[in-house]
Amino acid sequence: MAKQQTKRAQASEERDDGLREKMVAINRVTKVVKGGRILGFAALTVVGDGDGGIGMGKGKSREVPVAVQKAMDEARRKMVKVSLKDGTLQHTVVGKHGAASVLMQPAPGGTGIIAGGPMRAVFEVMGVTDIICKCIGSTNPYNVVRATLNGLMAVNTPAEIAAKRGKTIEEILG
């Protein structure tokens, strides 16, 4: 059952607005009431523009398609921009959320995306082509995606680092 959910969760599509969508996880949840159980679904999705834009959303509903649509809409509303350099990150960064930690390292061209599960979905829709990642601690999809986004928001361009240090970009790059 888990393998079927995983394959279904990897379904990706591109809409007419040019954004890439990927479903990360679908959970079946139950609420126990006096009359029995009430089934529901929770969906976790990521949306990206293929050029450093990324958004994460979660949706809940009694039916899977409605939950997925809610998650996609939330992901579109919460999109943020990350600066990339030749299809990879500017520098090594660690992202944390709860018990999940994600180590992300830039990689030379041709390496590909070396990342597992939820992290891979984030990088594919975001437009990253070369990266090396390791998930440490919790492997809960929601926490891993949040940790990945927290790490990506901490990426600085050489211009931002130079401005913080009061130096020129040439001094930073060496």
Curated annotation (Swiss-Prot):
One GO CC annotation: small ribosomal subunit
The UniProt record lists the keyword Chloroplast: no
Biological role: With S4 and S12 plays an important role in translational accuracy.
InterPro entries attached to this UniProt entry: Ribosomal_Su5_D2-typ_SF, Ribosomal_uS5, Ribosomal_uS5_bac-type, Ribosomal_uS5_C, Ribosomal_uS5_N, Ribosomal_uS5_N_CS, Ribsml_uS5_D2-typ_fold_subgr
Single annotated GO MF: rRNA binding
Subunit structure: Part of the 30S ribosomal subunit. Contacts proteins S4 and S8.
The name this protein goes by in its record: Small ribosomal subunit protein uS5
Membership in a protein family: Belongs to the universal ribosomal protein uS5 family.
Pfam families per the UniProt record, alphabetical: Ribosomal_S5 (PF00333), Ribosomal_S5_C (PF03719)
PROSITE patterns for this protein: RIBOSOMAL_S5, S5_DSRBD
Domain notes: The N-terminal domain interacts with the head of the 30S subunit; the C-terminal domain interacts with the body and contacts protein S4. The interaction surface between S4 and S5 is involved in control of translational fidelity.
GO biological process: translation
Domain S5 DRBM: 19-82
Gene from which the chain derives: rpsE
Keywords: Ribonucleoprotein, Ribosomal protein, RNA-binding, rRNA-binding
Keyword Oxidoreductase listed: no
Species of the source: Azoarcus sp. (strain BH72)
